[in-house]
From Swiss-Prot:
Stimulates sperm respiration and motility. It comes from Clypeaster japonicus. This is [Gln6]-mosact.
Length: 10
């Protein structure tokens, strides 16, 4: 989802 670690880092 949009709150996943990779999205937050990206």
């Amino acid at each position: 989802d949009s709150d996943s670690a990779q999205n937050l880092i990206g």
